[in-house]
């Protein structure tokens, strides 16, 4: 599917054929106004299981607010279903086993060791200590934080803390089965190049195993490389929704971000590369 002629206004460009998979989250008619600013404006979205969905858009577009509304951190008008059931009908305990949320900033001032922070993710699972430790070690290895295991959490760098919390939420949803949702708000913002790619590779692998993964990203090239679906948001509205090739059109990007770009093809992969003018 290709988009038709591009309008001059910020009319949403939406690929309505994209949602053919199992729907993990169905949100309809979301409205959110904070401080007099409309962050979500009659916002509808379905998030599919088995996909990485990247939320893109400029600062203040409503991306992080959408994640907070979907997970219940912020209340908004409208309806939200998780796997066909109203989110409010899920108990907190059940939701904790199936939904992992990585916020932009995680505050923890206690002098826990890094592995103890990761083990906190096992609290909802009601597993034995040995089982929890085994899962914890597996997830720490997955995101490359085993060497931080006995470091005090407050002594870690921002990127190290981010990876420790990623291991924690991976532990938390490790028993979710085929009803798993991960919401990652700028998970690569404090990471070096190698760990940016490692984090997104893990997200991609989880989606390939059936999880619904929603990621807020600012790096358009990382989104193009790892996401199955891109949803570009601005002014609380969806501006484009489709595959990387469909959504990352030069005129869309210039309208939304206010900056001209070139779109090229990656020399070794089937995804676009965005170059600034």
From Swiss-Prot:
Annotated compartments: Cell inner membrane
Pfam families the UniProt entry points to: ABC_tran (PF00005)
Main EC class the enzyme belongs to: translocase
Alphabetically ordered keywords of this record: ATP-binding, Cell inner membrane, Cell membrane, Membrane, Nucleotide-binding, Translocase, Transport
Residues at which ATP binds: 57-64
One Gene Ontology term of the molecular function aspect: ATP binding
Record-annotated disulphide pairs: none
UniProt key word Protease: no
Keyword Membrane on entry: yes
Highest taxon, organism lineage: Bacteria
Domain ABC transporter: 25-260
Topology in the lipid bilayer: Peripheral membrane protein
PROSITE patterns: ABC_TRANSPORTER_2 (PS50893), HMUV (PS51261)
Subunit structure: The complex is composed of two ATP-binding proteins (HmuV), two transmembrane proteins (HmuU) and a solute-binding protein (HmuT).
Free-text function comment from the UniProt entry: Part of the ABC transporter complex HmuTUV involved in hemin import. Responsible for energy coupling to the transport system.
Family of this protein: Belongs to the ABC transporter superfamily. Heme (hemin) importer (TC 3.A.1.14.5) family.
Protein name: Hemin import ATP-binding protein HmuV
Organism: Photobacterium profundum (strain SS9)
Protein's gene: hmuV
């Amino acid at each position: 599917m290709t988009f038709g002629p591009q309008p001059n206004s910020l009319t949403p460009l939406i690929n309505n054929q994209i949602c053919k998979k199992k729907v993990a989250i169905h949100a309809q008619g979301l409205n959110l106004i904070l401080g007099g600013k409309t962050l979500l404006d009659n916002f509808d979205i379905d998030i599919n299981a088995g996909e990485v969905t990247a939320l893109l858009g400029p600062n203040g577009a409503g991306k992080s607010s959408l994640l907070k509304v979907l997970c219940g951190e912020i209340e908004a008008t409208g309806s939200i279903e998780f796997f066909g059931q109203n989110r409010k009908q899920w108990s907190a305990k059940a939701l904790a086993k199936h939904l992992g949320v990585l916020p932009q900033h995680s505050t923890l001032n206690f002098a826990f060791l890094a592995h103890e922070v990761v083990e906190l993710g096992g609290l909802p699972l009601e597993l034995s200590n040995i089982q929890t430790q085994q899962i914890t070690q597996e997830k720490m290895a997955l995101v490359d934080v085993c060497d931080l295991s006995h470091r005090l959490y407050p002594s870690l760098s921002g990127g190290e803390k981010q990876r420790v919390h990623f291991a924690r939420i991976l532990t938390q949803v490790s028993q979710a089965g085929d009803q798993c949702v991960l919401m990652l708000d700028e998970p690569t913002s404090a990471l070096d190049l190698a760990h940016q790619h490692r984090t997104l590779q893990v997200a991609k692998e989880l989606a390939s195993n059936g999880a619904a993964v929603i990621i807020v990203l600012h790096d358009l090239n990382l989104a193009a490389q790892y996401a199955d679906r891109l949803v570009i948001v601005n002014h609380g509205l969806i501006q484009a929704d489709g595959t990387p090739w469909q959504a990352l059109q030069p005129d869309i990007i210039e309208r939304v971000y206010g900056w001209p770009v070139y779109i090229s093809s990656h020399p070794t992969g089937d995804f676009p590369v965005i170059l600034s003018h």
